[in-house]
Amino acid sequence: MSSSFFKKRLSPIKPGDPIDYKDVDLLKKFITDRGKILPRRLTGLTSKQQRDLTNAVKRARIIALLPFVNPEG
């Protein structure tokens, strides 16, 4: 079995850049077509960036900037 089952993506976020919950275009890059947050091994983010991203996505969902689930998939 090949070890490159998952394709690792290069992060569009630089280490010092803040992740803003109002930046919906950036957040959509880290969400699947069904609305799930991509894991860190696929996004290439640091652990702190992944935590900040998760909080930003959850906050954006609560204030209806992002859907909780995308049924169209």
Curated annotation (Swiss-Prot):
Pfam families: Ribosomal_S18
Gene3D superfamilies hit by this protein: Ribosomal protein S18 (4.10.640.10)
Disulfide linkage: none
Keywords from the UniProt entry: Ribonucleoprotein, Ribosomal protein, RNA-binding, rRNA-binding
Superkingdom, taxonomy of origin: Bacteria
Binding partners and assembly: Part of the 30S ribosomal subunit. Forms a tight heterodimer with protein bS6.
Identification of the protein by name: Small ribosomal subunit protein bS18
Primary gene name: rpsR
